[in-house]
């Protein structure tokens, strides 16, 4: 996913009528940048996904792809630079400063905006994570440029402008947004929306160190400690290989046990559509779709889910989608690979039993070995 153009994209003639001449101060902005998000010294996977997408955009534009790294001096920051090259970057802009050890909006915004003003990128991409959303908004505001959030598709049009597609009107429509008269063109993309690129053995390229300083007394926010939010019960749907999800077709909260049993049987995780969270049947971290988690599993089983646009954009990156619904005209059958027109409540126990029987010999073999 990430290359599909929305029907909402205006024709070239309509865009031409909206487009003014790019102001003189923006005409030398070039290249594609990806902000590399570090989590306690480790690169967030969404950064690699964005490097893959950024590589494609840079090749279309005939420009370079740069990874942007803000962090403290040390091996973890240099390792992040090496990883940027392995996932497609041509060069890395590096700001090493002890004040950037932990994320705080003020120093990160100042460092990134200084980099942009100095080196003038045409496109700047960030992950739509908690950190990325906070940083992207403040950087765009500081630079007086546009920002398209939570994109499901990125492309370059015939004029070389970034076409950023995202759902709108509660997920019922897709729109394509352009930043025509400001630079850089900024967009955020959630984890797992873009495909993870293949890691290469590309040698380390050019690293440009940017000398940047800020005084601690100029920063309002102070870090007093770090408490991990690594709770074992939290859903990790975004990176699960197998996901089973339920919707309103399950009829009541008790029937959620059916998707949990199936997920447990086939070694997967479970989730739900937005209406079930709104009803209080499942917590928000189990929601799948544009306003929840975006998933890209090898197998996705949707039970009793109609498949509205906001759900579709969160799941259509799956390798195999199996849809179970009583309505043969449900939108989910338009993009599912396998469709079963039946009552999910009756079908799920039979499916779980079939998987149990099929997997039993393999399970016994693993125990013996």
Curated annotation (Swiss-Prot):
Domain of life according to the entry: Bacteria
GO terms, molecular function: electron transfer activity; flavin adenine dinucleotide binding
Matches recorded under Gene3D superfamilies: HUPs, TPP-binding domain
Binding of FAD, residues: 299-327
Residues covered by region (Disordered): 1-20
Keywords in alphabetical order: Electron transport, FAD, Flavoprotein, Nitrogen fixation, Plasmid, Transport
InterPro entries: DHS-like_NAD/FAD-binding_dom, ETF_a/b_N, ETF_a/FixB, ETF_alpha_N, ETF_asu_C, ETF_asu_C_CS, Rossmann-like_a/b/a_fold
GO biological process: fatty acid beta-oxidation using acyl-CoA dehydrogenase; nitrogen fixation
Subunit and interaction comment: FixA and FixB form a heterodimer.
Function, as annotated: May play a role in a redox process involved in nitrogen fixation.
UniProt family annotation: Belongs to the ETF alpha-subunit/FixB family.
Protein name: Protein FixB
Origin species: Sinorhizobium fredii (strain NBRC 101917 / NGR234)
């Amino acid at each position: 996913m990430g290359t599909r153009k929305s029907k909402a994209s205006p024709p070239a003639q309509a865009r031409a009528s909206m487009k003014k001449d790019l102001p003189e101060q923006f005409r030398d902005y070039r290249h594609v940048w990806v902000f590399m998000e570090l989590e306690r010294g480790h690169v967030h996977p969404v950064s690699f996904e964005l490097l893959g997408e950024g590589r494609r955009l840079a090749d279309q534009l005939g420009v370079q792809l740069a990874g942007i790294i803000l962090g403290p001096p040390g091996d973890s920051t240099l390792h992040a630079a090496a990883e940027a090259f392995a996932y497609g970057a041509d060069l890395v802009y590096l700001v090493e400063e002890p004040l950037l050890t932990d994320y705080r909006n003020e120093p990160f915004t100042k460092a990134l905006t200084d980099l942009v003003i100095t080196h003038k990128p045409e496109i700047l991409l960030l992950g739509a994570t908690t950190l990325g959303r906070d940083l992207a908004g403040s950087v765009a505001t500081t630079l007086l440029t546009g920002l398209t959030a939570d994109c499901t598709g990125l492309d370059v049009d015939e004029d070389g402008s970034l076409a950023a597609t995202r759902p709108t009107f509660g997920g019922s429509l897709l729109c394509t947004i352009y930043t025509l008269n400001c630079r850089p063109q900024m967009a955020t993309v959630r984890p797992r929306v873009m495909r993870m690129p293949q890691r290469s053995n590309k040698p380390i390229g050019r690293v440009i160190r940017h000398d940047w300083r800020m005084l601690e007394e100029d920063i309002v926010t102070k870090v007093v400690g770090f408490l991990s939010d690594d709770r074992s019960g939290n859903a990790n749907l975004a990176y699960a290989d197998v996901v089973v999800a339920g919707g309103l077709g399950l009829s009541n909260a008790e029937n959620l046990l059916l998707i949990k049993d199936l997920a447990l049987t086939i070694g997967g995780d479970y989730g739900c559509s937005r209406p079930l969270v709104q009803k209080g049947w499942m917590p928000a971290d189990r929601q799948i779709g544009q306003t929840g988690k975006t998933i890209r599993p090898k197998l996705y089983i949707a039970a009793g889910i109609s498949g509205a646009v906001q759900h579709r954009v969160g799941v259509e990156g799956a390798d195999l989608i199996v849809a179970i619904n009583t309505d043969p005209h449900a939108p989910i059958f338009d993009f599912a690979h396998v469709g079963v027109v039946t009552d999910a409540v009756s079908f799920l126990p039979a499916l779980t039993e079939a998987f149990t029987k099929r997997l039993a010999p393999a399970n016994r073999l693993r125990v013996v070995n």
